[in-house]
Amino acid sequence: MNDTRPLLDRILSPRDLKKLSTKQLQQLADECRKELIELIAMNGGHFASSLGVTELTVALHHVYNTEEDRIVWDVGHQAYIHKMLTGRRSRMQTNRKYGGIAGFPKIHESPHDAFGTGHASTSISAAAGMAAGRDLKGGREKMVAVIGDGSMTGGMAFEAMNHLGDLKSDVLVILNDNQMAISPSTGGLKNHLVDITLNKTYNKARRLLWNSMSLLNHEGAKNALRRLEDGMKAALTPGAFFEALGLRYFGPIDGHDMGRLVRALKEMHELPNPKLLHVVTTKGKGFLPAEENQSGWHAHSGGFDTTTGMTAKKTGAPDPPKYQEIFGEALVEMALKDPAITAITAAMPSGTSLDLFEKAAPDRFYDVGIAEGHAVTFAAGLALEGLKPVCAIYSTFLQRALDQLIHDVALQNLHVVFAIDRAGLVGEDGPTHHGAFDLSFLHAVPGLTIMAPSDAQELRDMLHTALYHIEGPVAIRYPRGSSGGGPLRKDFTRLEPGRGRIIREGTGPVLFAIGSMVQAAVEAAALLEAEGIKPDIVDMRFLKPLDTALIDRLAASATHIVTIEENSILGGLGSAVSDHLASSPKKTPLLKIGLPDRFITHGSMQDLYRETGLDAAGIAEHVKEFYRTPVH
């Protein structure tokens, strides 16, 4: 890391920014930006968003006192500069690493982190709630919500602004408008948030007004024309929309002009009641590769040249395809033959690999923005029209649409396929993004078929089975990252709903595994065999309907039963098997292995599997201890 950061080296806390001049603040922003580029090149992490708000972050800490005032960073992946300036610079190299600082704001990590974030569109609600609490207590601290235009596509943001206008509390909403979320933002609001200088009607009328002013000598007439221009501008800018919600609107202003930012924030600091400052920024600002490919540089794994952005070419065998790629390619393969297949994403086309579908069948691809609830009910509408909607959504974000899944899809038994991406642990993004609960909350939904593939071919077959051989709603959950490779058939095989498969037969304990844990169970079995324990291994494939016939048959002769899942230990496969066997006359000892009943931290997948006991060694140790413990 470069040590020539004369201003940044002097910043031990945000208080050190208070006496800096505008010129010094800009120098500090430049130093922060350079350090961030070096940091991400070394360790990886979220990138382009923090580059885009560097000046804004410095200006906020110059004007506000985050030991008392509250700044809520929506989503939170743009808060790296904030962390540098709030006493965590020396720990930034541990960012997102096991035992290190988190990649998102966390209230237990620093008093300067006002609210824990990770999901989109929550900041205004949190700031409004804190403002209401402040008002009840007679406090004077300031509340600020920093939200991007991508997060503004989420309905929760509008619910909060609608309420905030009614509360009339002193809250500043800063709209960071970079025309992007992770991928380019979607919808009517994006089109509304266009710089007024690009509006042809406004510019034509403005030229006419200024030409008229040049002919006038009367100052009163000139002032009247200026007021007319202001009124016209208000009618054509987003201000009219936000003002209708009860927020005073200011802007848009250049989010990279330090002087304008500081002046505007100082003005906002003194104004009562809710207001919105519209700041226009460039995602990836200051690093040309990120400016030119903002989606591609939203986050990076590191190892790139800090000038060119080039990464060293990998040598050796190529990486196996990711589950996301297998899903996207299989869906396109079927969609090219079936015009009824449609695809829906909530602002994550590239993350889910639905960008492949968008290129192949753009007229049947729908990016609804950060609006998971709408995505699910929209899919329900498509299903009622006889189409085959596939809604690809991260497990952690599906939590936001559970009501719609139950009420609008399952209750009507509509044929919607949910491709649940990032199921299980996701690594460095941590507890806000782990998909730890989907088997549990989906298990209780009547009529919902739930599947989990153990490899790439099973994912292809499950997607085909879901689209063509199952009626009603279907959920397929699969993990982030590598599918493990292996040959893929060109055709698809129908899987019998509610039927598992025995992978290997043994003599003693039976390991019932599902999804990503099937391979882990196979590896654990190899370790157990060295200890003289030879278990049966079952790939359950389906959580619902559960293969009770296979469970009963194996339980009849099993000495011990073990369930293994990359899901909360509560409510998933272990609970389903335990509930089923509860009425069995034979009481076979049962061990449930899964994610413990707590939120799992961030870190590498290897670290997290080791901590939770879901790596092969951990599973083998659990089974060995269970198998050798006398039954009373």
Curated annotation (Swiss-Prot):
Q: Which InterPro entries match?
A: Dxylulose-5-P_synthase, THDP-binding, Transketo_C/PFOR_II, Transketolase-like_Pyr-bd, Transketolase_C, Transketolase_CS
Catalytic activity annotation: D-glyceraldehyde 3-phosphate + pyruvate + H(+) = 1-deoxy-D-xylulose 5-phosphate + CO2
Please give the Gene3D superfamilies that the UniProt record associates with this protein.
3.40.50.920, 3.40.50.970
A GO biological process held by the record: isopentenyl diphosphate biosynthetic process, methylerythritol 4-phosphate pathway
Associated pathway? Metabolic intermediate biosynthesis; 1-deoxy-D-xylulose 5-phosphate biosynthesis; 1-deoxy-D-xylulose 5-phosphate from D-glyceraldehyde 3-phosphate and pyruvate: step 1/1
* SMART domains for the chain: Transket_pyr (SM00861)
Q: Subunit info? A: Homodimer.
Q: To which protein family does this belong? A: Belongs to the transketolase family. DXPS subfamily.
Q: What is this protein called?
A: 1-deoxy-D-xylulose-5-phosphate synthase
